[in-house]
Amino acid sequence: SVGFKAGVKEYKLTYYTPEYETKDTDILAAFRVTPQPGVPPEEAGAAVXAESSTGTWTTVWTDGLTSLDRYKGRCYHIEPVPGEADQYICYVAYPLDLFEEGSVTNMFTSIVGNVFGFKALRALRLEDLRIPPAYIKTFQGPPHGIQVERDKLNKYGRPLLGCTIKPKLGLSAKNYGRAVYECLRGGLDFTKDDENVNSQPFMRWRDRFLFCAEAIYKAQAETGEIKGHYLNATAGTWEEMIKRAVFARELGVPIVMHDYLTGGFTANTSLAHYCRDNGLLLHIHRAMHAVIDRQKNHGMHFRVLAKALRMSGGDHIHAGTVVGKLEGERDITLGFVDLLRDDFIEKDRSRGIYFTQDWVSLPGVIPVASGGIHVWHMPALTEIFGDDSVLQFGGGTLGHPWGNAPGAVANRVALEACVQARNEGRDLAAEGNAIIREASKWSLELAAACEVWKEIKFEFKAVDTLDPE
């Protein structure tokens, strides 16, 4: 008939297309959908596809001015979640033309910007995204990547060691710099600003940068190793953030830091471009991630945030510990650690990976294990994360009974012992405690650390677990 048919029609008539064959250029999404009672899964899945692409609640005559078939998102497959009543995984394909090139901001605004408040859904979670190579090639990605970082630091064949300076708020710049020096001098590769250290009344950013640079150069001169401190450039405006990064570059330090979720993807991508152009490494903290990713049935899984960060740009990102005080189940954590580091990752539902992901030539990101870890965890961390990682001990360095430098010595000795044992073919998982005990005979600092933390464990069940097979 001529003209258009006004009124409301079911989403599934247009947006549920089980016969659709996905294209190599489509962005694919896996959503965990919990429909409201009485809403069939096909309608719920189609609603997700519609509301995150071309749809609106009623038919509009301007639909006739474009080709919906070319631009609409399509829900092409739905499967029930085993062990959960009323939960479904809905797979949605989005045509590449819906997205601005090189903009994580636009990608998220489209895919998750509006649909999560949709009334027909009780809850909605984005579990995974497949980013096609055609879209990945529009991003610069990490400023440098894993291999370039190793070459800049001249450190190979072992994980890197870090430490967050505590107390995170309240120290003066000079005392802060002193703690940085002691940790680096003791044997750590990096120290770190906490995520909420920006430029507060008790310590303005410029003073901190100067004292930390002094600490770095002094520790480098005394140890003959390249050292770094993650200078947090996060600020209230984009211009101020870049100003801080420029000052860090002028001081000649190797690395700056950004809180990418609170700072925002637009600011983060700008900073990543600046860092590549000017030879700075970029450490990323994921402050605010648990607001988005912790609930199992609503929000966005961290593996999606991790993929987005690799596209936006960062050389390090915090990725849980598996063994410390912060959330992270082993298989799931290793799944997104591989997504950060490797060039090509096969679909593997047992690790929560819903799609095969090809990163083509985008550099990798080093995962950072941080939060409630100490020397007794070293064998497990070395085994789980391997060489391309940063192991970060805040309290596990600064809480040493003899002070900061001995705390750093203890961590470095423990790490070197674990790496040597692994290279000799010993089983770190089975012999970990024995390896640490042997090493502590040769290091009084390590022996003291072993004594303090011998019984500390953070044993709680993970909130976000895999579905039963």
UniProtKB/Swiss-Prot annotation:
Q: Keywords for this entry?
A: Calvin cycle, Carbon dioxide fixation, Chloroplast, Lyase, Magnesium, Metal-binding, Methylation, Monooxygenase, Oxidoreductase, Photorespiration, Photosynthesis, Plastid
Look up keyword Lyase and say if it applies: yes
Reaction(s) this enzyme catalyzes, per UniProt: 2 (2R)-3-phosphoglycerate + 2 H(+) = D-ribulose 1,5-bisphosphate + CO2 + H2O; D-ribulose 1,5-bisphosphate + O2 = 2-phosphoglycolate + (2R)-3-phosphoglycerate + 2 H(+)
For this record, the Gene Ontology CC terms, alphabetical, are: chloroplast
**According to the UniProt entry, what is the EC number of this protein?**
4.1.1.39
Protein's job: RuBisCO catalyzes two reactions: the carboxylation of D-ribulose 1,5-bisphosphate, the primary event in carbon dioxide fixation, as well as the oxidative fragmentation of the pentose substrate in the photorespiration process. Both reactions occur simultaneously and in competition at the same active site.
Fill in the misc note: The basic functional RuBisCO is composed of a large chain homodimer in a 'head-to-tail' conformation. In form I RuBisCO this homodimer is arranged in a barrel-like tetramer with the small subunits forming a tetrameric 'cap' on each end of the 'barrel'.
Q: Which family does it belong to?
A: Belongs to the RuBisCO large chain family. Type I subfamily.
Q: How does it assemble?
A: Heterohexadecamer of 8 large chains and 8 small chains.
Spell out the protein name for this chain: Ribulose bisphosphate carboxylase large chain
